[in-house]
């Protein structure tokens, strides 16, 4: 059984050095020893300023004060978090005993006689307020250069802040020169000899915080980036250099320049220039970050060999994924850049994507366990989709996890949560150990569970295990009936040290979920934890043992695992025997402190695999304290700086505390270093497992490799991650590699060099290449049209494919691929593809591919006009294609056939839905069309007005029983409709001159036939009392007569070519009368060529000619040759068989003259009466 040594033995040892031991008497806390400490903080942010220390004893005290607490108040150790007596407290240097040959320097000591100011961390270590000269301006002596060369040979990388010169013992009353202030506690001497005499150093190596962020950021006050007046070699301050000896050449002389022309001086200048460059880059906010992709080539080989995965996901998953991505573009991307809105939308959509894929993974039948539980990622029998989901989840959570309050969650918290959710080999272990009897501490995995809980960020679980351990029930050798392992004073000491350890862990910011590891809270916590560890070691190893001589003084943890470093020497065995705390508990508590203080070796020892080690290092690692021992891991340090941005969730926000070790740190850089440190250790990295390779790509920030691997498992997941990464700006934009100096190499030579200029990823970029492959698979995918999306709409594969292609980064490449899909779809269009055409048109317009939309609708309009009688639909699609000539052709077909048959065509029963709605509810229909395309609606409404007026004329004429008005009124209404059509046809030949720019609605080719229809409203020259079988009642008004007379005069004055076309169409109309000359003839026989070789109307369009031929010959259901037509009248009845155009004009002139004379007489009679 472990027993504490007798008090008499302990009392014979000399007491540790304290600033004022008498004032600490009576303290009951075993950790209230006030020995001054030399241990520096291990936090990345450096020494905390005075404003962080509140009212604690770390506030600056007067030089002569030996204690910062009252005589009546007992001193309290920093380990407990109350009051004074800390190893890092004030005044340690002046209160050291003479027996301490290696007295530690006080890191927080104030300058004598002065009150420290509350200044930022970087300035708290400076001793001068004025701007100091740059090291580039200092002259260099021969002796200095020789010393530097010797130092360079011993160690290539000099230790910052290491004093130079002979080591001297420091007397008790001698003023101490501050390590970080650059000034002594007494006024500095003026001579160089005196300065050398007063320069003191410690007898042992002194830990330092390293350079803080302010030493680079505040270039206004210090050019070199070093503290005080020291440089990298530890020279004296600038006042020494300014006192130049007579034999030393003046600064700037030739001899001075020659002295500087040495390798050592060149190396110093190079290091100085690099420091200045880094400081300048940080101040300018440079955005370049160097990456070291050690596994990029391996990942490329793997996903190239795996190829592209087939599209086998269920339709509902594909539709839901696309719906979320469309939501991302609709809500997050607007006409104006809004990083805040985009950042919020990215985070929300990322969570929804993960949940959607999780539901599908849960629905997949899981394979039976085959002993691969401890593998990283899904097992070898897992489905490809599950592997893709596992990798994509980490990538999305890494970049777009948000806290509950909407802010950016610190990345360590995100990774700890992901690790516990996705890679937890110890699920339920803490609860199992807490239920273990007789006590949790008796469990064989008790300490491992404590270490694992800390390593995984579960600080509360670790404290709960320690608090409820039940040390009083632990028996030796783990036997149930054996002797108790701890009793009496040993048990009391165990309980005390464990309670104090628990109190430290409870003060850890991670205990409350604060994982902003570069914040001031973490800085103060690690200062306190370091002090607590020192007190623990002093108490456990004996009061006469100084910290520097402690077995665990290095606190690197590199020499031990869980069982500790077995020192079998007599000194080691004696130290164990003298320990106040049982050695196994003491060793384990050291590991606990090593983990929370970020010791790399202890973290690696506690981890079970490289993934756990990577995330554990990322969350806890204090890199500066390991730099000297791990220089081989520092090759990947990035000197660039990535500018912060809201849409890049991982880049640190602009707090100066985030800049450490002469470098602008980011979480991604730290994650890459943690990963490289983990795989460089003894952990096995399975390069044959694509999932582990994908994890390596994520940790190295190689997003291209991640997407390439995802593409080998699931195209929907790969495409989604690529788009989110592109919008989130964590996928670098594609920059095609130049082929400079490679033009003369053939493909074999390029293959040897590893260059494939024709690879899709090299040509299009990994994002566009992935989207192209996904779109090609969607076009061939079957089954989507049977499932409704979230909006309740059926969507086909090609529709999703075009939507995906519209999100490519390259507009040219996107249009090229869309054109291929459109051409493929157009080849399969039929007259029943209306719904497909509407969807395709809508999508192409949303993607701003107007040209493709117009070509597609024009092609579909041709199909309708050629293979159907849906003339209204054909006109609408021509209008959508913005082809007014095509719209005019269809309208000319309808007008010509109506005039030839002298009736409305097509009949009301054969109207297609489009034409029916345009004729019956023209205003409302055009309003609906205008919502889709305003220009197309205007074009269709304008072109259709002439045909609508002509059809209205025939409807009024033929529907005798449909109206209740008198015959005279009906004839007047019919005349008004016909006159409007005649006026439109005459519009292009006003004054006998053809002017196509007037863009008349009705072609002038129909003017003679329209005038023939007007003969029924004009007095018969042969019998003025009869109007085509009706009483000679005036039908036309004077204005209408005027319109007809103008049309007659314009037609007679027009060119012969135009008149001949009109006359030939008139002959066609007369020949089409019942019993006319057209019987047995084809319409094409009547479409003769004019004298100029131009065909007359209808002949210019084979489409219209074929339609006219089919209709006239009764080749369709709309054929009027098989359906008797009931007309109100037919103007061709009673006309001579060989009637010409001149005859129509002559009859109109005579009839109109008589009607006009009758109107004048009636007007004159009205005036007389």
UniProtKB/Swiss-Prot annotation:
Assigned protein family: Belongs to the nucleoporin Nup85 family.
Molecular function terms, GO-annotated: structural constituent of nuclear pore
Name this protein carries in UniProt: Nucleoporin NUP85
Record's compositionally biased regions (Gly residues): 80-94
Annotated Pfam families: Nucleopor_Nup85 (PF07575)
Stretches with biased composition (Low complexity): 34-49, 95-110, 191-210
Chain intervals with Basic residues compositional bias: 156-165
Primary role: Functions as a component of the nuclear pore complex (NPC). NPC components, collectively referred to as nucleoporins (NUPs), can play the role of both NPC structural components and of docking or interaction partners for transiently associated nuclear transport factors. NUP85 is involved in nuclear poly(A)+ RNA and pre-ribosome export, in GSP1 nuclear import, in NPC assembly and distribution, as well as in nuclear envelope organization.
Superkingdom as given in the UniProt entry: Eukaryota
Stretch list, region Disordered: 1-210
UniProt source species: Chaetomium thermophilum (strain DSM 1495 / CBS 144.50 / IMI 039719)
Gene: NUP85
Single Gene Ontology BP annotation: mRNA export from nucleus
